[in-house]
Amino acid sequence: MQSVGRFFDGESGQRLSVDLSVDTAADTLKLSHPELPMGSQYWPLVAIRALSDHARQDQLVLSLKADAALDSALIVTARLTVDDPDMVSILRRLCPDIGRVDVPKGTTGRIAKRAGLAVGALVLMIFVILPAMANTLARFIPVEREVAYGKAVVKQMERFMGGRGDQGLTCTGSKGRAALDAMIARLTDAADLQYDLNVNVFDHKMVNAFAAPGGQIVLMRGLIERAKTPDEVAGVLAHEIGHVEARDTTRNALRAAGSAGLLSLILGDFAGGSAVVVVAEYTLTASYTREAEAEADVFALEMLNAAGADATAFATFFDSLSELERLTPDLPEYLSTHPELVDRAAAARAFARDQGVTTPILDDAEWAALKKICT
Amino acid sequence: MSSQIQGRYFGTGKPLFGLYFKTAILTILTLGIYRFWAKTRIRKYIWSATSGDGDSFEYSGTGLEKFLGFLVAIVILAIYLGLFQLLLAFIGISIIPEDDSQAAIAAQAVAINLSILAVLPLMLFAQYRARRYKMARTRWRGIRFGMEKGAWGYAFRALGYIFLTIITLGLLNPLATFRLEKYMADRSWYGDARFEQMGRWQDLYAGMKHVFIGLGIIIAGVVFAIVTEGVGIAGVAAVIGYIWLLIGLIYYRVYAFNYLTRNKVLDERVMFDAHLETGAVIKIFVVGTIVIGLLMAVIFGIIAGIVASMSSAIMAGTASPALFVGLAIPYALAFLIAGGLSLVMITQPMIKYAVESMTVLNAVHLDTIHQRAADTGADAEGFADALDVGGAI
Ligand SMILES: [Zn+2]
């Protein structure tokens, strides 16, 4: 079989029309041209590779298997273009590894090393460096700025949950308000707090509560309705006060700002990718750290104890929440960011066993008023 | 050897669409990791479809090196962005007043813009690096193209020219276009031969004429409205002026491309010619957009129809999760098809048109050009991948 190919030696820009012939006995492709060194070159058929994803089906661009080199710029550069249809089909048939991609030695190790470094750097940033910096910097924010920021956060939350107009979602029943104030007074009388608390109830059916920077705390109507006793509400409130006093919310805001967008760097922008990123970032940044939760629990139990309230209520509320968890597969936020309800209920029960005499945090009339704060 | 080489493009829609679709599916299945290989394979196709004097171009980059470069880039970016954003939030909370919502919104806007300013130099840096990488991985007749290092120099100059363009309300745009292209062209090589960008930046003002006419119509409309208090004519003028301005911007880009190509010289001998026409470019874009738009309308219409017919089941909560998955798949597929179609019906025809409008003059001299040493510094465009700069291909 004889035909012509275009040969580039990879050293000069000159094109040589070489005569091609396949020697099936020696399994080689012979290239001959007077200007080639010694007049000819022999390419072993097993070492011939065709460039992949080549647009022109009627043509093959061939190279010889390169010595392994990770940097593709270093790969041997001689090229042979074959246009003759017969020669193209013969070479496709006779060259066993024509479509093979040669992967240089040590590739897997190199990928593993770099991927490990990249993942390590991200984990270190998101879970160690950013939280540590957030902890340090949170201390340097003046309290009045924190309060202003917290109010803005609450306002944003209110709008996000559907509150419109001047009054928004905040419940203003005067008797209920008085009961709530009584509860706060009872809880905080013995405590020495660094923030002035600003506790409100939102008219929303979600069983949830949240704290924002600078002493802002919001309880949802759903949570008050779900609670069996006022002491259960007091337990949640005390827990949120714990977050406020530890400045968890401020630290969280700083940490969330720092890690925003880091995940979308990795995943890139492919179909459906952005949705995954949003969900992952939410779970990453919306929750406090496990230690912060545990500390807020300890704070709440001690606050209940100092107020002479029964810490068992803290446990019974967790029981009723875990029941709720079983009933509804779509977890309310409070549950999803406050895991391990059973363990926490057990810890509260153990604490309650050592308590002395306790009295209900509100009387029946006050409790009834609090339940109607949104009507 | 001919003394003139006319660019030719052999790519067709069907195989490229197939390649795009296949690699996009693999990208989804690998949670995005395959995207480096996907981009490489599409480049290999487009490069190999381009030919001059019968000899195809070659893209010799690999997906693997792109992936490795990307892994390095995210380490640096994660540290830089993380620290910068956290500090910005700290300053935002402790200094900017947020007592009323108006101020809060303003503060947020400032913070977001600062965040863009932090990334902008990196994006410009990445832009140069991406072009350098592509040059280093492009071959014709076995001879490598190449580009000298200079990404930071480019980023700083680009920042300066962007600033100049903004404060002169776009008047100095030709200066920015010309000087930045010259910065890159003068550092470019084919083998051991160097490119040089000739010409003068003032010559590009001829290409700005339709931009000025469009702006003139808008301004005249506004003045007319103020003088006569007639809003109707001002509205008509605004619409006409806006469309004129948009077309004028395309005209400018085409004009600048032609001018800059005609004034490039390789090794002081080889010259180039380009004669793209604005009308043809707009036609490719408009036809492609209309066809894709109609197709997508049909596909999404069918999906919406299915949803509507099942809405009673969805409302009642009796719809099975399988139904939602069954709807999510065609939805994702429709997006993939749209992406593939825009590659095949807009990007590729544009490339074909540009390649075939170009001529290399005095091409005999190309025979004397020799291979250059490999650019070991032109490593893969990790930053460009991480920051998503670099455009369609
Ligand atoms: Zn908590």
Where are these regions (language model features)?
Chain B
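Transmembrane-helix bundle segments that line or gate the permeation/cavity pathway
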Residues: M1-L16, Y20-A193
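Juxtamembrane/interface segments at transmembrane-helix termini
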Residues: W37-Y45, M123-R139, L172-D186, G248-V265, ...
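Juxtamembrane inter-helical linkers in multi-pass membrane proteins
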Residues: Y45-S60, K134-W152, K182-L204, N258-I282, ...
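Select subsegments of transmembrane alpha-helices in polytopic membrane proteins
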Residues: E65-I79, D203-L215, I284-M296
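Membrane-helix interface segments in multi-pass membrane proteins
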Residues: L81-V119, I217-G248, M296-L343, G391-I393
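Loop-centered beta-sheet repeat module
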Residues: L169, T177-G230, A237-A238
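Extended non-catalytic domains of envelope/secretory-pathway proteins
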Residues: T177, G199-I213, I217, A225, ...
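Intrinsically disordered cytosolic tails
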Residues: I250-V254, N258-L260, M271-A274, T278-I393
